[in-house]
Protein backbone atom coordinates (compact mmCIF):
# COMPACT_ATOMS: atom_id res chain seq x y z
CA UNK A 1 0.00 0.00 0.00
CA UNK A 2 2.78 2.43 0.95
CA UNK A 3 4.65 1.77 -2.29
CA UNK A 4 1.52 2.50 -4.33
CA UNK A 5 0.95 5.66 -2.31
CA UNK A 6 4.55 6.78 -2.87
CA UNK A 7 4.34 6.36 -6.66
CA UNK A 8 0.73 7.53 -7.03
CA UNK A 9 1.43 11.21 -7.95
CA UNK A 10 4.27 10.52 -10.39
CA UNK A 11 2.32 7.78 -12.17
CA UNK A 12 -0.70 10.06 -12.56
CA UNK A 13 1.59 12.88 -13.72
CA UNK A 14 3.14 10.59 -16.35
CA UNK A 15 -0.25 9.34 -17.52
CA UNK A 16 -1.72 12.85 -17.72
CA UNK A 17 1.28 14.03 -19.69
CA UNK A 18 0.95 11.16 -22.17
CA UNK A 19 -2.80 11.79 -22.57
CA UNK A 20 -2.69 15.60 -22.62
CA UNK A 21 0.24 17.96 -21.96
CA UNK A 22 2.64 19.22 -19.29
CA UNK A 23 0.13 21.74 -17.94
CA UNK A 24 -2.61 19.16 -17.43
CA UNK A 25 -0.02 16.83 -15.93
CA UNK A 26 1.13 19.58 -13.56
CA UNK A 27 -2.42 20.16 -12.33
CA UNK A 28 -2.88 16.42 -11.87
CA UNK A 29 0.43 16.21 -9.97
CA UNK A 30 -0.64 19.03 -7.66
CA UNK A 31 -4.02 17.43 -6.93
CA UNK A 32 -2.54 13.94 -6.53
CA UNK A 33 0.12 15.20 -4.14
CA UNK A 34 -2.46 17.00 -1.99
CA UNK A 35 -4.52 13.78 -1.93
CA UNK A 36 -1.42 11.69 -1.16
CA UNK A 37 -0.43 13.93 1.75
CA UNK A 38 -4.01 13.91 3.02
CA UNK A 39 -4.02 10.12 3.05
CA UNK A 40 -0.63 9.99 4.77
CA UNK A 41 -1.81 12.49 7.36
CA UNK A 42 -5.02 10.52 7.95
CA UNK A 43 -3.03 7.31 8.44
CA UNK A 44 -0.13 8.66 10.49
CA UNK A 45 -1.57 11.86 12.02
CA UNK A 46 1.50 13.79 10.90
CA UNK A 47 3.62 14.70 7.89
CA UNK A 48 7.40 14.49 7.92
CA UNK A 49 9.38 17.66 7.15
CA UNK A 50 10.39 16.25 3.75
CA UNK A 51 6.76 15.53 2.89
CA UNK A 52 5.77 19.07 3.84
CA UNK A 53 8.61 20.54 1.78
CA UNK A 54 7.67 18.40 -1.22
CA UNK A 55 4.04 19.47 -0.98
CA UNK A 56 4.90 23.17 -0.69
CA UNK A 57 7.35 23.05 -3.61
CA UNK A 58 4.97 21.12 -5.86
CA UNK A 59 2.19 23.59 -5.13
CA UNK A 60 4.49 26.61 -5.55
CA UNK A 61 6.27 25.49 -8.72
CA UNK A 62 3.09 23.94 -10.10
CA UNK A 63 1.18 27.18 -9.61
CA UNK A 64 3.96 29.16 -11.28
CA UNK A 65 3.96 26.68 -14.18
CA UNK A 66 0.20 26.99 -14.67
CA UNK A 67 -0.20 30.74 -14.08
CA UNK A 68 2.79 31.74 -16.21
CA UNK A 69 2.25 28.89 -18.69
CA UNK A 70 5.95 28.05 -18.44
CA UNK A 71 6.97 24.43 -17.87
CA UNK A 72 10.46 25.38 -16.69
CA UNK A 73 9.13 25.90 -13.17
CA UNK A 74 7.82 22.37 -12.63
CA UNK A 75 10.93 20.95 -14.31
CA UNK A 76 13.23 22.79 -11.89
CA UNK A 77 11.30 21.82 -8.74
CA UNK A 78 13.31 18.61 -8.13
CA UNK A 79 16.59 20.49 -8.54
CA UNK A 80 15.52 23.05 -5.94
CA UNK A 81 14.27 20.34 -3.56
CA UNK A 82 17.39 18.18 -3.81
CA UNK A 83 19.66 21.22 -3.64
CA UNK A 84 17.91 22.46 -0.50
CA UNK A 85 18.18 19.01 1.06
CA UNK A 86 21.92 18.84 0.32
CA UNK A 87 22.46 22.31 1.79
CA UNK A 88 20.40 21.53 4.90
CA UNK A 89 22.26 18.25 5.53
CA UNK A 90 25.66 19.87 4.92
CA UNK A 91 25.01 22.94 7.10
CA UNK A 92 23.62 20.76 9.88
CA UNK A 93 26.58 18.38 9.75
CA UNK A 94 29.50 20.75 9.29
CA UNK A 95 28.30 24.08 10.72
CA UNK A 96 25.88 22.99 13.44
CA UNK A 97 27.59 19.65 14.20
CA UNK A 98 24.21 17.87 14.00
CA UNK A 99 23.43 14.75 12.01
CA UNK A 100 19.89 15.10 10.68
CA UNK A 101 19.77 11.50 9.51
CA UNK A 102 20.61 10.24 12.98
CA UNK A 103 18.05 12.63 14.48
CA UNK A 104 15.37 11.33 12.10
CA UNK A 105 16.22 7.64 12.05
CA UNK A 106 18.29 7.06 15.19
CA UNK A 107 15.37 5.59 17.09
CA UNK A 108 14.84 3.02 14.31
CA UNK A 109 18.45 2.19 13.44
CA UNK A 110 21.19 1.62 15.99
CA UNK A 111 24.44 2.51 14.21
CA UNK A 112 27.87 3.75 15.31
CA UNK A 113 28.35 7.52 14.99
CA UNK A 114 30.99 7.15 12.28
CA UNK A 115 28.48 5.23 10.12
CA UNK A 116 25.85 7.94 10.69
CA UNK A 117 28.45 10.49 9.56
CA UNK A 118 29.22 8.53 6.39
CA UNK A 119 25.52 8.09 5.64
CA UNK A 120 24.96 11.81 6.03
CA UNK A 121 27.81 12.58 3.61
CA UNK A 122 26.45 9.96 1.19
CA UNK A 123 23.03 11.64 1.31
CA UNK A 124 24.61 15.03 0.64
CA UNK A 125 26.37 13.56 -2.41
CA UNK A 126 23.22 11.80 -3.57
CA UNK A 127 21.13 14.98 -3.28
CA UNK A 128 23.76 16.99 -5.17
CA UNK A 129 23.88 14.32 -7.88
CA UNK A 130 20.09 14.26 -8.22
CA UNK A 131 19.89 18.08 -8.28
CA UNK A 132 22.58 18.23 -10.97
CA UNK A 133 21.18 15.48 -13.18
CA UNK A 134 17.64 16.88 -13.00
CA UNK A 135 18.95 20.37 -13.76
CA UNK A 136 20.88 19.05 -16.74
CA UNK A 137 17.93 17.11 -18.17
CA UNK A 138 15.55 20.03 -17.51
CA UNK A 139 17.87 22.51 -19.23
CA UNK A 140 19.11 20.52 -22.22
CA UNK A 141 16.40 18.03 -23.10
CA UNK A 142 12.81 18.28 -24.32
CA UNK A 143 9.90 18.29 -21.92
CA UNK A 144 8.98 14.79 -23.07
CA UNK A 145 12.49 13.54 -22.31
CA UNK A 146 12.34 15.19 -18.88
CA UNK A 147 8.95 13.56 -18.10
CA UNK A 148 10.33 10.15 -19.12
CA UNK A 149 13.42 10.82 -17.00
CA UNK A 150 11.18 11.64 -14.01
CA UNK A 151 9.41 8.29 -14.31
CA UNK A 152 12.42 6.09 -15.06
CA UNK A 153 14.68 8.19 -12.83
CA UNK A 154 13.02 6.52 -9.84
CA UNK A 155 15.66 3.83 -10.32
CA UNK A 156 18.27 6.20 -8.78
CA UNK A 157 16.73 6.35 -5.29
CA UNK A 158 16.02 2.62 -5.34
CA UNK A 159 19.65 1.81 -6.19
CA UNK A 160 20.88 4.34 -3.61
CA UNK A 161 18.65 2.92 -0.86
CA UNK A 162 19.62 -0.68 -1.65
CA UNK A 163 23.33 0.26 -1.61
CA UNK A 164 22.79 2.11 1.65
CA UNK A 165 21.04 -0.92 3.15
CA UNK A 166 23.88 -3.19 2.10
CA UNK A 167 26.39 -0.75 3.61
CA UNK A 168 24.68 -0.38 6.98
CA UNK A 169 23.56 -3.98 7.52
CA UNK A 170 26.90 -5.22 8.94
CA UNK A 171 27.01 -2.22 11.29
CA UNK A 172 23.54 -2.57 12.81
CA UNK A 173 23.65 -3.10 16.54
CA UNK A 174 21.61 -6.10 17.62
CA UNK A 175 20.25 -5.91 21.16
CA UNK A 176 18.86 -9.46 21.12
CA UNK A 177 21.07 -12.26 22.51
CA UNK A 178 22.27 -14.90 20.07
CA UNK A 179 20.89 -18.42 20.44
Swiss-Prot record:
Protein name: Inner membrane-spanning protein YciB
Family assignment from sequence similarity: Belongs to the YciB family.
Entry's localization field: Cell inner membrane
Stored PANTHER family: INNER MEMBRANE-SPANNING PROTEIN YCIB (PTHR36917:SF1), INTRACELLULAR SEPTATION PROTEIN A-RELATED (PTHR36917)
Superkingdom as given in the UniProt entry: Bacteria
Biological source species: Variovorax paradoxus (strain S110)
Chain segments annotated as transmembrane: 24-44, 49-69, 76-96, 121-141, 151-171
Pfam families, alphabetized: IspA
Keywords: Cell inner membrane, Cell membrane, Membrane, Transmembrane, Transmembrane helix
The protein's role, per its UniProt record: Plays a role in cell envelope biogenesis, maintenance of cell envelope integrity and membrane homeostasis.
Entry GO CC: plasma membrane
Membrane topology label: Multi-pass membrane protein
Organism placement in taxonomy: Bacteria, Pseudomonadati, Pseudomonadota, Betaproteobacteria, Burkholderiales
Gene from which this protein is expressed: yciB
Amino acid sequence: MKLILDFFPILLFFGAYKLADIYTATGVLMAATVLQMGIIYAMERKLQAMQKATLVLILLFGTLTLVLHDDRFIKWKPTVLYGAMAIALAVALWALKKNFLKMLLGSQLQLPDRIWGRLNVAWIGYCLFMAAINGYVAAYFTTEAWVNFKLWGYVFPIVFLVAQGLYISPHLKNDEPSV
